[in-house]
């Protein structure tokens, strides 16, 4: 009788609570004392390579947060009597080395199901490498994929999974109506208890190692040094929250937002804020790396509704999590089209590459204060409000006419909550490339509606600290005497091209409630498609971003 090794390949599921792979490993370990469980996480070099447009995909802020998430998981596993093997390199090589090769040995790799091409190709590479290694020694290797990233399980959604979700609506409201009426959120899977995963095998070496920023395969040494600096010293005092990675911090945030601060009760009224830690849940970074599951969040919300209050705010957080699900399933349906310039609708448009405009957008020097404030916050903290994300995406893609994929790349580099499906699906939609009405944001009106006194702008654009609220949307329109008196040193608005949206088959739609297709008050959950165009997907940043 050969040995059995169970490899838990952690990726975007860095938690023990409500983790199907962990639960499956515990079950297998309970069947025989000969079963050994090896949890592993790989900082795969694939994700650190530059994008097709030359930008480093994995930035310093993401590096810091991910290291914290992995370290927290390692600590939790050690508390159970297990451990986490952490490696840098290629997942296929690392996991192949863990494959048993003795006669009649078997290796079972457990991993969370992912939906986008890079991850699924990685799955195939790991599966092939482990099988080849096992066969060389008359052993066997299999991979089990377990669904775990969404609120609704893929086996429960009322769409045809066998056809690649070809019948999934391309607008949110029909999707939401169907899943809410026909799906039940599954119960949260309990976390393992002490010794349920057994002890890691002595034959596997290197459990004591935990990488430093300099060990990660960053695209440059400068990014590694910035990552190290962020770990050692640097919470920007203007940051909305001191984001610390890991399941323990994620669960603490859920507890704080719902039970300790009671802010859930007023979420609907505050969710469009841009300053402070509690205008929204701020769960997005932990959700993106799987430090907390949406099912656990909803389970706690249901308990809150039972014990305290059920209102529009409690529902709205769940509503946002359903948006998150929508983009995950949308990516599964459309595949690599979410990365294509013409988008999922195949719309043709004239895009430009203007390095001056793109650089100004990235550095927050466009001359549009609301845009500049949001972009500076992103660079400094790795976070931006939902409201800000909608505005900066609309400005870059629809006002400046810059290839929207540069914006998606920049977000991928910086966002602590980077999630492939959400980021690329939302940017594709913001650029009008998912079909239907194009939602173009009026930045001056957005400033008036959401930062009328300029409090947020002045927090991040210090050179505007003395500008009166009446001129905060366009400081250079202030009287010369005022500008001279306060020593205003702020760039004029960049001259932008006049866009012809008729070539895209749909004129810009009117804004409603100051938000239109966004996650704010004005977002229609869906709309009637314009004649001659495909159905619309609202330009919305999922969840809990805000």
Swiss-Prot record:
Residues 497-546 are annotated as: Disordered. Its cofactor is FAD; (6R)-5,10-methylene-5,6,7,8-tetrahydrofolate. Residues 511-525 have a biased composition (Gly residues). Pfam families: DNA_photolyase, FAD_binding_7. It is found in: Plastid, Chloroplast; Mitochondrion. SUPFAM superfamilies: Cryptochrome/photolyase FAD-binding domain (SSF48173), Cryptochrome/photolyase, N-terminal domain (SSF52425). GO terms for biological process: photoreactive repair. Binds 1 FAD per subunit. Keywords: Chloroplast, Chromophore, DNA-binding, FAD, Flavoprotein, Mitochondrion, Plastid, Transit peptide. Residues 4-151 form the Photolyase/cryptochrome alpha/beta domain. It comes from the Eukaryota. GO terms for molecular function: deoxyribodipyrimidine photo-lyase activity; DNA binding; FAD binding. InterPro entries: Cry_DASH, Crypto/Photolyase_FAD-like_sf, Crypto/Photolyase_N_sf, Cryptochr/Photolyase_FAD-bd, Cryptochrome/DNA_photolyase_1, DNA_photolyase_1_CS_C, DNA_photolyase_N, Rossmann-like_a/b/a_fold. GO terms for cellular component: chloroplast; mitochondrion. The keyword Transcription regulation does not apply. May have a photoreceptor function. Binds ss- and ds-DNA in a sequence non-specific manner, lacks photolyase activity. Belongs to the DNA photolyase class-1 family. PANTHER family: CRYPTOCHROME, CRYPTOCHROME DASH. This is Cryptochrome DASH, chloroplastic/mitochondrial. The lineage of its organism: Eukaryota, Viridiplantae, Chlorophyta, Mamiellophyceae, Mamiellales.
């Amino acid at each position: 009788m050969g040995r059995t090794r169970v490899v838990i390949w952690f990726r975007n599921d860095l938690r023990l609570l409500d983790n199907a792979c962990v639960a499956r490993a515990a079950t297998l370990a309970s069947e025989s004392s000969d079963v050994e469980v090896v949890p592993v996480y790989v900082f795969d070099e694939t994700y650190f390579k530059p994008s097709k447009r030359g930008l480093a995909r994995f930035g310093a802020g993401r590096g810091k947060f991910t290291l914290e998430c992995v370290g927290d998981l390692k600590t939790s596993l050690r508390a159970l009597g297990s451990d986490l093997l952490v490696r840098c390199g290629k997942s296929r090589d690392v996991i192949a080395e863990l494959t048993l090769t003795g006669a009649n040995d078997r290796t079972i790799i457990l991993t969370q199901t992912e939906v986008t091409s890079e991850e699924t190709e990685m799955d195939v590479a790991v599966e092939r490498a482990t099988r080849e290694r096992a066969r060389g020694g008359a052993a066997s290797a299999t991979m089990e994929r377990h669904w775990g990233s969404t609120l609704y399980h893929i086996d429960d959604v009322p769409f045809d999974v066998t056809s690649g979700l070809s019948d999934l609506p391309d607008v949110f409201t029909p999707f939401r109506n169907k899943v809410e009426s026909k799906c039940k959120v599954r119960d949260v899977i309990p976390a393992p208890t002490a010794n349920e995963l057994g002890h890691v095998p002595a034959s596997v070496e290197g459990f004591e190692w935990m990488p430093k920023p300099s060990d990660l395969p960053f695209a440059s040494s400068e990014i590694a040094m910035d990552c190290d600096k962020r770990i050692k010293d640097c919470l920007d005092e203007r940051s909305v929250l001191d984001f610390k990675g890991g399941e323990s911090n994620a669960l603490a945030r859920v507890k704080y937002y719902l039970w300790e601060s009671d802010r859930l009760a007023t979420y609907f009224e505050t969710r469009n804020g841009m300053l402070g830690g509690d205008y929204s849940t701020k769960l997005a970074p932990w959700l993106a790396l799987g430090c907390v599951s949406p099912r656990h969040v909803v389970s706690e919300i249901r308990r809150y509704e039972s014990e305290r209050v059920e209102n529009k705010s409690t529902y709205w957080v769940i509503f946002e999590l359903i948006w998150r699900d929508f983009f995950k399933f949308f990516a599964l349906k459309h595949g690599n089209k979410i990365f294509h310039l013409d988008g999922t609708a195949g719309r043709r448009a004239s895009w430009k590459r203007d390095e001056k405009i793109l650089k100004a957008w990235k550095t927050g020097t466009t001359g549009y204060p609301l845009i500049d404030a949001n972009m500076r916050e992103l660079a400094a903290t790795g976070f931006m409000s939902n409201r800000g994300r909608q505005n900066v995406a609309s400005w870059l893609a629809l006002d400046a006419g810059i290839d929207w994929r540069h914006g998606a790349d920049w977000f991928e580099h910086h966002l602590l909550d980077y999630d492939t499906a959400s980021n690329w699906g939302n940017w594709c939609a913001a650029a009008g490339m998912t079909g239907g009405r194009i939602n173009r944001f009026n930045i001056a009106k957005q400033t008036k509606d959401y930062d009328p006194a300029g409090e947020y702008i002045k927090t991040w654009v210090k050179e505007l600290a003395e500008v009166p609220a009446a001129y905060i949307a366009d400081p250079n329109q202030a009287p010369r005497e005022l500008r001279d008196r306060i020593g205003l040193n702020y760039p004029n608005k960049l001259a932008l091209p006049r866009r012809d949206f008729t070539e895209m088959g749909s004129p810009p739609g009117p804004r409603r409630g100051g938000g239109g297709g966004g996650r704010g008050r004005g977002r229609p959950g869906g709309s009637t498609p314009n004649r001659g165009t495909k159905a619309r997907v609202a330009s919305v940043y999922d969840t809990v971003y805000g």
